[in-house]
Amino acid sequence: ASWQDGIKEYRTKKGLKHVYDEYVNVGVFYVSDDFIKTSGSATGHMKLLKSIKSDGSVKEGETISVTYSCNYIPKKDNIYQTSNITPMIRQNECYLLVYDKIVNSDISEKFETHGAKLPINYSTGNSASWDISPLRLSDSQTLKIIEKGKVYTIEELSDYDLFTCGTGILQEWYRTKDAILRYYVGDNYAELAANWKRKERTGNE
């Protein structure tokens, strides 16, 4: 059996719908500014757009200073050992994140997550539609857009995804990301991100 089969078996035994279920806090965050990458971490600001599960430590609409552990590998359970995808945090993008209880202190907040980018578009319009369409998926180096209708291999897609990981983990992530977002956010998760981006641009509710 593959390690993917092992994950599914573990989820079934534990009654887990998704890897996020053991966390207290789950939310959709909007990235307010560019994150500054340092060795093993990145710092910046995020606004909580939608609270999905929460202990109340961060309120919807609140912007917090964040230190993101870029090399973080969750330790809570074996299931998390295969979920070490690391998002490259980018300004004006939205992410589904799980995080530990926020403690009031002078240091930035720590997020425990492998993350799921919100949303992902494999078929996009031309550059003129970037400002009104959901957040685009593009090559992290050249910002070249994925071509509509073209079939890509996992290796080719990894060049266009803003994540770093092995292709096996990437393949598993592609299979589960939509289910995760729909489970916690709803079927309109892509619309949610597009509307939020429009509000930030125009200042209108």
Predicted regions, residues:
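Extracellular/periplasmic catalytic domains that process cell-envelope and extracellular macromolecules
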Residues: D21, T38, S57-K59, P87-Q91
